[in-house]
């Protein structure tokens, strides 16, 4: 019994919730219908009769009660001339990767519709400002942007549409739009390039027999001073044209276009690309002044230069569209990369010369011959012998010193008898038995002392012999690399600037 009561209670609750939800939904629909605007031609006679006879609303109702927005003005007669002009609020920078640009504009269209002539009993100004909701009740040109990628209206806080109806039947519509337009770029001279971006306004359904777009005389595109991050755009560089197109099977369609000329500012790329890569190339030349046998310093310097330039090339390639032709910036980066790589190759050639046994032996022979020619050969050896017998003087002196100093001095008088000047510098409490006649400490168990240790000491390692050819390559590179790079700069900037 309890189970049945619980089930019935739950069923009642679910029915009540469903009914409340349906009522709320219907009320929302009702509210939407109340907000919906009906054109005078769609209103009933009773609704129209409620409007005061002398009011502006009544005049509009009289104009539109028999108005059919599906039929163009001058139907089966002369084509409708639509005068177009544009006011540019903002101009977004060109995106190289997607090849497009974004603008925010006021699009204004003006045409004459004889059916909308204000009656003679209308008392007021020559133009009647109408609520934007009435825009849908009128016939309007089917204008679209031929090179548009995306676009949107603005409706904050209300729909950004302005509608004027003039006494003679002229209609002026102004609307605010944000449009992304395609702009095919020619990046051959990038970043010293100048781009021409178009905005094409075309009729979608009406041929030239029914509709014609015409630029407003004088100044059809108003452009205030706009600062772009990478480009310069001037009002004098704006061009206007006619782009009427023929489509097979349908005919000719009216089209007008405006062309913006944008000149790129090179300052960003000078500071961000050209200056750093130039310094990296100059940095790679420092290896020419480093000793050829210092591979630990020269190799990392060359590798660092090449990797830095390669990284710069990769970074810029990711920011630019993948085009099949060579850009001006590509020429610069490739040249810098080649100069950096050439400095690394130059050191490889120097190393080959440095490690060539034949060249090393030839260099040793040349040095010996030069020393002999300078008098550092036989005469020097003769002067350094004892009485010319061939025994070196320092060896004879060492032998005599060892003979004289085999006995250990036992008193300071022994040191004085040998006339050594170091006696005064000896400490007072020194052990005479531990000093030889020279006043130097000796080992008790080794009578030879330090004289033998000096004889057994290894001679210092000989300095590496660097062939003249290796030095000559570095010498030539110091002048050749800067000269070639300077010559490349003269040619490069004379072509692309």
From Swiss-Prot:
Channel opening is triggered by extracellular glycine. Heteropentameric channels composed of GLRB and GLRA1 are activated by lower glycine levels than homopentameric GLRA1. InterPro entries: Glycine_rcpt_B (IPR008060), GlyR_beta__ECD (IPR047031), GlyR_beta_TM (IPR047029), Neur_chan_lig-bd (IPR006202), Neur_chan_lig-bd_sf (IPR036734), Neur_channel (IPR006201), Neuro-gated_channel_TM_sf (IPR036719), Neuro_actylchol_rec (IPR038050). Glycans are attached at residues 54, 242. One of its GO terms (cellular component) is glycinergic synapse. The record marks 307 as: Important for obstruction of the ion pore in the closed conformation. Residues 1-22 form the signal peptide. It catalyses: chloride(in) = chloride(out). It is a multi-pass membrane protein. This is Glycine receptor subunit beta. Forms heteropentamers with glycin receptor alpha subunits. Heteropentamers with GLRA1 can be composed of two GLRA1 and three GLRB subunits, or three GLRA1 and two GLRB subunits, or four GLRA1 subunits and one GLRB subunit. Forms heteropentamers with GLRA2. Functional GLRB-GLRA2 heteropentamers contain four GLRA2 subunits and one GLRB subunit, although alternative subunit composition cannot be excluded. Forms a heteropentamer with GLRA3. Interacts with GPHN. The gene is GLRB. One of its GO terms (biological process) is startle response. Keywords: Cell membrane, Cell projection, Chloride, Chloride channel, Cytoplasm, Disease variant, Disulfide bond, Glycoprotein, Ion channel, Ion transport, Ligand-gated ion channel, Membrane, Phosphoprotein, Postsynaptic cell membrane, Receptor, Signal, Synapse, Transmembrane, Transmembrane helix, Transport. Residues 290-294, 350-472 are cytoplasmic. It is found in: Postsynaptic cell membrane; Synapse; Cell projection, Dendrite; Cell membrane. Changing residue 242 to A: Loss of glycosylation. Prevents proper assembly of the GLRA2/GLRB heteropentamer receptor. Glycine 1 binds at residues 108, 174. It comes from Homo sapiens. It is linked to Hyperekplexia 2: A neurologic disorder characterized by muscular rigidity of central nervous system origin, particularly in the neonatal period, and by an exaggerated startle response to unexpected acoustic or tactile stimuli. NCBIfam families: LIC (TIGR00860).
